[in-house]
Structure formats: C-alpha cells, structure tokens
Amino acid sequence: MDKEKGLLIVLSGPSGVGKGTVRKKIFEDPTTSYKYSISMTTRHMREGEIDGVDYFFKTKEEFEALIKDDQFIEYAQYVGNYYGTPVQYVKDTMEEGHDVFLEIEVEGAKQVRKKFPDALFIFLAPPSLDDLRERLVGRGTESDEKIQSRVNEARKEVEMMNLYDYVVVNDEVELAKNRIQSIVEAEHLKRERIEAKYRKMLLEVKK
C-alpha cells in the first residue's frame, strides 16, 4: 500500500496559554514521530529560547522581504510583531509521510485553514482568563499594559474556538500532551483519510 501522506497538526491558542510548554513536552516524548515546523518571528528572543529551535528570529526588514517572496503558508502581526510559517519545509515533509506539528497564533491558524483545509486544528485553551492572566504575570517579562492587551486579545480568540476541530484545556501539561497525542492517533484512523488508499488498492487487484 502507498505511504500515507502526513498530517499537518496545527496547535493554536491565546498568548500565555502554554503552547510552547506543551509542544516541548510532546517532543520530549521518545514515542513522538512528528516533525516540528519552526515558525519565524520578529519578536525578541526570550530567556532560554534558541534561534532555529524555538523560532527563527528575524528583523522586521528580513521578514517583510520574505513576505514579498511569498515564502510563508501564513503570517500575521500580533502585539506589534510578525509571526509566520515557512511553506516549503511543511509541504516536503508531509509528502514524505511525516506528520508536521505547527504551533502558531490564532490569526495565523485562520490563514492555514484556507490553504490546508484538511489539516488537524487543535485549540489550546486556558482553564480560565484569570488563570491566563496569572501565567502572563508569572513570566515577569511584560508591563501591566501589555498583559492587559494580551488578555483582551485572548477573549476574542477564545470566541473563535468554533473554527477548530478539537479543544484541549491546558489545566495540566502532561494531560494536555496526552490528549493531543490521542487526537492525532485517532485522526489517522478516520475513514476519509484511508478510504482513497484502499480504493486504489482494490482497483489494482482488479487489473
């Protein structure tokens, strides 16, 4: 039977919900076989982040040059910074049969949905907006004004969870990781994803 094309797994949610933490937990698991699609951004590197591992960090000028070159699946501006997903790596990796894991902001996920309607969209939600505020304050990296801006944005983003296939509440990182892995495993077993392969196999048997 032909190799199954990989899934594009899109993990999205409000800033501060713990997308990066959950993603790291998933990739620390030795059973994980997904390939991570590293996003590009113009925001400042946070303590502990590594260029080319967590993000590709670019200047605004570099990023805008890549936009003109049509080098992104999606890009968006969020709280004054650009975020984007380089396109070629994603396409090539999926064709090789690997699942590609993409961690992006909500605005970017909307663009991906238009270009990759068959992708798997998972919304990572906070237990509450108060919990989200506490996480943002706990980072100790932003002013009260910027934190309030992110919480206000999160309110709008939570209202858009109906655009996603699944919602995972990040009340505990290990549980969120397990839920996401279970969703991906189940998605591979969906009839629509394998029916075409079997139809082709049956046609070849008849020849």
Swiss-Prot record:
Similarity comment: family membership: Belongs to the guanylate kinase family.
Subcellular location(s) per record: Cytoplasm
Domain Guanylate kinase-like span(s) in chain numbering: 6-185
Protein's UniProt keywords contain Glycosyltransferase: no
Superkingdom as given in the UniProt entry: Bacteria
Cellular component aspect of the GO annotation: cytosol
Reaction catalyzed: GMP + ATP = GDP + ADP
Function (record text): Essential for recycling GMP and indirectly, cGMP.
InterPro entries: GK/Ca_channel_bsu, Guanylate_kin-like_dom, Guanylate_kinase, Guanylate_kinase_CS, P-loop_NTPase
Family annotation (HAMAP family): Guanylate_kinase
Matches recorded under NCBIfam families: guanyl_kin
Name of the protein: Guanylate kinase
Keyword ATP-binding: yes
Keywords noted in UniProt: ATP-binding, Cytoplasm, Kinase, Nucleotide-binding, Transferase
